[in-house]
Design a protein with these regions (language model features):
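Cytoplasmic membrane-interface "Motif A"-like loop-to-helix N-cap segments
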Residues: 90-102, 312-323
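Extracytoplasmic gate region of multi-pass secondary transporters
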Residues: 43, 249-298, 392-396
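Glycine-rich segments within core transmembrane alpha-helices of 12-TM secondary carriers
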Residues: 161-185, 208, 383-395
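Central cavity-lining transmembrane alpha-helices of secondary-active solute carriers
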Residues: 67-86, 105-107, 293-306
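C-terminal transmembrane helical hairpin of 12-TM major facilitator-type secondary transporters
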Residues: 316-363
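Multi-pass alpha-helical transporter architecture, strongest
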Residues: 212-219, 418-444
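Extracellular/periplasmic helix-loop-helix junction of adjacent transmembrane segments
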Residues: 46-79, 126
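C-terminal ends and interior cores of transmembrane alpha-helices
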Residues: 102-120, 324-339
């Protein structure tokens, strides 16, 4: 195991080289960007994939089938979290993050090789489902590992700022996926896009995976994990899964509630809305993707500043502001989007994007702080992935089904409002972690 270039201060604090912190944050964020490029591509090309893999005369049925395969990957995420999380607490964060990178890239690359339904029939959607399950299993260890890695490297007083770069990477990945799909949609004919063009973004995952693996293999283990190993003086005893769940049940419930509001709103805006604009509101596909692309670019600009704000005012006030905003502004925002004009759609989507920044900026620092070092990766993986699987990843499928059953185009707003209520209760119950050491770890400061 690689050891970090950090020293112990006389008072017991961990003093880490700022250059090493930036390197760790950059590598984790870049790897996360590559992971979420894959998910972003699937989301933004969902309408085309529905025609390739799920032939039907009903566009809503095609979209529902495509999002069904999308949601299926989230059903195995908790299993991936139960495997990779405890493993990361035992053998190290860096090794597990390298494995998740390989698996995610392989699953995405495989999608680009699958023949269409017209070529092999029912085998096509079955192979798509298999590839999505590989992606979902690997992603079960991704976010918790990356956020844990950054949180354990960052100094206590700047953990919010450094953690915000993880979601900066997520947005960059989404923009890469959305930008590529938008470019192909504009340049290729419908026939070319359906016959071969849709494969290009998935095949790009091959070389991207190699780059991501290189970045993660160069990472060094966190000072907090290294200190845990030193305490054991030998092989670390295996922490029972029961201890990660039953021993942390209060923190797990808080984690699941926070992840619920974070991911329902995240997947609603970044994954579902492009297809909502095209399939349900009959909005021009290219214009819809460009609006979402612009919203994500705006979020990227604001993201680091919002992360730094959480270090000054705390995580709780920022998350609470996001919950209040989604509770009271979701209906006006969706009404604006439904107006259909470019300005109205941009204003509605932009408002939702700025509210989402309250979560993307605060959560990477707030969630790891719920658990002690010994079980942080494992417990966070379990809580995060169970919540994402039940509520976040299923958002496009559930909202599409609700609209189909009721005919009510305001369902996205109602769904976000319900999530905001759950998130508000979690904020009320959680403790403030800004500027404080992570549970089970020594205070962390940055050398100058």
């Amino acid at each position: 195991m690689k050891s970090p270039r950090a020293v112990r201060a006389p008072a017991g604090a961990t003093v880490t080289d700022p250059a090493l912190v930036r390197r760790a944050v950059k590598a984790a964020a870049l790897g996360n960007a590559m992971e979420w490029f894959d998910f972003g591509v699937y989301s933004y090309i969902a309408v085309t994939l529905g025609k390739v893999f799920f032939p039907s005369g009903n566009p809503t049925a095609q979209l529902l089938s495509t999002f069904g395969a999308f949601a299926a990957a989230f059903l195995v995420r908790p299993l991936g979290g139960m495997v990779f999380g405890p493993l990361g607490d035992r053998v190290g964060r860096q090794k597990v993050l390298a494995v998740t990178m390989i698996m995610m890239a392989a699953g995405t690359f495989a999608i680009g090789l699958i023949p269409s339904y017209a070529t092999i029939g029912v085998g096509a959607p079955l192979l798509l489902l298999a590839a999505r399950l590989v992606q979902g299993f690997s992603t079960g260890g991704e976010y918790a590992g990356a956020s844990t890695f950054i949180a354990e490297y960052a100094p206590d007083k700047r953990r919010g700022f450094f953690g915000s770069w993880l979601e900066f990477g997520t947005l960059a990945g989404y923009i890469g996926g959305a930008g590529l799909v938008t470019l192909m949609t504009a340049l290729l004919s419908t026939d070319d896009l359906l016959s071969w063009g849709w494969r290009i973004p998935f095949l790009i995952a091959g070389p991207m995976g190699i780059i991501g693996l290189y970045l993660r293999m160069r990472l060094e283990e966190t000072p907090a994990f290294a200190a845990e190993v030193e305490k054991a003086e030998a092989n670390r005893p295996k922490v029972p899964l029961r201890e990660m769940v039953a021993g942390q049940w209060k923190a797990l419930l808080l984690c699941m509630a926070l992840v619920l509001v974070f991911n329902v709103t995240d997947y609603m805006l970044l994954s579902y809305m492009p297809s909502y604009l095209t399939s349900e509101l009959k909005y021009d596909e290219t214009h819809g993707l460009l609006v979402v692309l612009g919203v994500m670019a705006l979020m990227m600009i604001v993201q680091p500043f919002a992360g730094a704000l959480t270090d000054r005012v705390g995580r709780r006030p920022v998350i609470a502001a996001g919950c209040a905003g989604f509770l009271f502004l979701s209906i006006p925002a969706v009404l604006l989007i439904r107006q259909g004009s470019l300005v109205a759609v941009a204003l509605g989507m932009g408002a939702l994007g700025l509210l989402l920044v309250c979560f993307t900026a605060a959560m990477p620092a707030a969630l790891p702080a719920l658990f002690p070092t010994r079980v942080r990766y494992g417990s966070l993986s379990i809580g995060f992935n169970v919540s994402v699987s039940l509520f976040g990843g299923t958002t496009p499928l559930v909202v599409t089904a609700l609209i189909g059953a009721t005919g009510n185009m305001m369902m996205p707003a109602y769904y976000m409002m319900a999530a905001a209520v759950v998130g508000g209760f979690a904020v009320w119950r959680m403790s403030e972690s800004a500027g404080r050491p992570l549970p089970g770890s020594a205070p962390a400061v940055e050398s100058h």
